[in-house]
Design a protein with these regions (language model features):
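Glycosyltransferase catalytic domains, chiefly GT-A lineage
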Residues: 1-130
Length: 130
């Protein structure tokens, strides 16, 4: 039901729609090393990644198992290894590179009773402190 027009469905970020301001916030609150985030955002700008091209909450995603989604997983992991571990910065870039436009799951991901898909998600802190 969530994969009618695409192979991937995710939750929309509740506050922002762009990786560039998200990267600044990640640096400001020290969720990751600023040099990693700066290098990542500079690389994406050099690759002509557009502003306001979507930002997602990613504790869970719904997807089909296809060659493209398998490639997405490998490319996404490559970005996380090269740059920031903040997956929501790299995910939109990888989707864009592969021509994937995720559909949006209803509700919010990181709230109790915020959606009908995952009634409660357990939060784990996996931040690299700067």
């Amino acid at each position: 039901k969530y994969l009618n027009d695409t192979d991937v469905a995710v939750f929309k970020h509740p506050e922002r729609d762009c990786i560039y301001p998200e990267g600044k916030i990640v640096m400001d609150i020290k969720f990751d090393h600023p040099n990693l985030v700066e290098d990542q955002l500079a690389f994406y700008k050099d690759m002509c990644y557009p502003e306001h091209n979507g930002l997602y909450e990613l504790p869970v995603r719904v997807q089909r198992n296809t060659p493209t989604t398998q490639r997405m997983g490998w490319m996404w992991w490559e970005q996380i290894c090269m740059f920031s571990s903040r997956d929501q910065i790299s995910f939109p870039f990888v989707c864009n590179q592969l021509g994937i436009k995720p559909s949006i799951l209803p509700g919010r991901a990181n709230t109790i009773r915020g959606n009908d898909i995952m009634p409660q998600l357990v939060y784990s802190n996996h931040n690299r402190k700067a």
